[in-house]
Amino acid sequence: MPLSSAPSVSTGFASSVIFDLDGTLVDPAGAITGGIAAALAAHRVPVPSQQVLDSMVGPPLLTSLKALPGVTQENVASIMDHYRSSYLNSGMAASKVYPGIRELLQTLGEFGVARAVATSKPEPLAHRLLEVQGLAGLIDSVHGSHPDETVPHSGKTEIVAAALSAVGADGVDEHQRRDRVVMVGDRIFDVAGAHAHGLRCIGVTWGYAPEGELEAAGADHLAADAAQLADLLQQLLGLSSSLRSALA
């Protein structure tokens, strides 16, 4: 349903939702952290604690790897290749869509709300993950980092900017944009990327943020499950029909 024909969306409220991917729509279910650990071990690099591994879900992987003891300019590319190969071969399929997310995306589309993804994952991998998880048809545009992870990396602010352009919200003033677009993510980077463009951000607590991170980052709202997220989106987007009912 095109945006212009959606009677459920009130003019002046958000008409788009920008979602993070890993930890927000899809649970890597250990595919990312386990894959990183295996790649490090294969290169005889010390494997960090689970807490550190969890913190690597969200930000650019190359940046996170370079911060680890034992990762050098000489071995980082090989570690990345090892991880990516494992992720493509088995990690994507092992990932799982969070409960209620598929139904929520479907209903947002039926209400005429544009659904974009803004992720630090390389864009081709993001497309592939959405296809493998059966979500590709429920997302209107996908925005990620450069496929070559050795080139300067686009930050979340730049990736959100690309999503805003895709949904047609880059040409409106900040007040209108704030009323029409909502960001949803699980890490500090999502909150910062949203606020850099004057957007409200719903932080989902089922992802990979350490305790207190989303609150400290200034997330405008918090959702503990898809039902709470549905209620918040209904309120912020000014929808006249219930999103929560689609999750039953």
Give the residues covered by each predicted segment.
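Active-site neighborhood of HAD-like aspartate-dependent phosphohydrolases
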Residues: P2-S55, P69
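Short, acidic loop-to-helix structural element flanking the phosphoryl-transfer center
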Residues: P7, G12-F13, N89-V117, E123-H127, ...
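Helix-loop "lid/cap" segments that line or gate small-molecule binding pockets
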Residues: A39, P60-E74, L129, I159, ...
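Metal-dependent phosphoesterase signature
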Residues: K66-E103, F111, D173
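Substrate-recognition "cap/lid" segment bordering the active-site pocket of phosphatases
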Residues: E123-V182, I188-A196, E211
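Structural recognition of alpha->loop->beta junctions
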Residues: G134-G144, E213-A230
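Acidic, Mg2+-coordinating phosphoryl-transfer loop and its flanking beta/alpha structural elements
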Residues: M183-A223
